[in-house]
Amino acid sequence: VKELRKQPGIYRQVLKSKLEVGISPLNLNSTRLTASLLAETNGQVVSHSSLRNLLDKHRFAESSDPRDKVYAFLGLANKSLSPFRTQPNALIPDYNLSVQEVYTETATVLMSSYKNLSWLSHVEDASQRQISNLPSWVPDLSVSLQPYPLRYRGPAHWAAAGSRHWRPAVTNMRKGLLRVQGIQLDHIDQTSLLIDESEDPSAGWASIVNLALSLDSPYPDPGATGKTPSRVEVLWRTLTTDIYNHTYPSPSETGLLFIDYILNLQIRHRLTPWSSADEFQPHHSPLSDFIYPNWRKLFELEPPDSQYKLSSYTKRLTTVVESMFNGTYSPIGLAQLQHELDQSGGRQRRLFKTRRGFMGTGARSLRVGDEVWVLYRGGLPFVLRPLPNGHYRLVGESFVYGVMHGEALKMGLLREDIVLE
């Protein structure tokens, strides 16, 4: 956009407008320019992207024929990279195939070529799917992907199953059945509300605080790291997937930013009546006791040496309020934290707790009774929903604090072979 403003040409009026174009046109224009350079140089100078990268990049694009969300990029993909490096005749356009068949074959080709399950992270929430009868493990490429896969959050290099291998059963995959290996980490027994699921914005935070209050102390340590994170620390590290400003794990200072964030929420909520269009009534509280987040109790339960204990919290509250009144306080430093919370949870991912006391964040559609699995070559844990026939449906990827780097493999849990459909 900066370069375009220097020489706007025919785009001058567009740049003056308040039109919001989003990322899709920019990505399409980038790919168009790359294709033009390839044509000019006979493909000798400009390196072009893998098919997988193109599918990622243009997930937000629209197409009158959903099959073209795959077929349109076959001619632009680098044939020396996967999947064509090992399957040169893969994905030949055939409009006699249904959308379901094209998307299932695409998932089969990509996963069997890369020999990992990371493509599962591209499955959108069930509430967003539009193509019917797709296997649960096959992304619906006809719709935009929101939120984006967690692996794009930062340099975490998660490997929940360590270096365990997975061998694709291609014949079964083409039939819509994905055979995988892994360990069942736990069952989900408590979930939070999302921000848009209640008319009162405090209800979501109240459910999140209740999740944190239900955690055991000490928090599970399957990796025998010797770490004893408090409830508040587990909470903010889970809410941000332990990433702050592309740093993993998040620096401890992020926890203090989180405290400031909570203070700002509480102050804003308590002042709501003052900004109401109705006449202010001193006896009126905008929040009922039932849904008001019980932060005080959470801070009271912090260990004596915790930087989040109640005395530290109240001291910081006094400092923030005083600086607000004298005009020296600025919440601008919370902008990055808000971004991390939005990307990791907030309106798009649901916080959960498991029976063994793990806390995690996952797909919007997850619910109590779903199971958390560490699948070989999956990178992250996944939430699965058991079916009456013994198979499973994929709900989505997840972040589970404390088991993102192979720690679950030390828990003595049984390795199982299961089928996703």
Each language-model region and where it sits:
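Acidic/Ser/Thr/Pro-rich low-complexity tail/linker regions in eukaryotic proteins
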Residues: 1-421
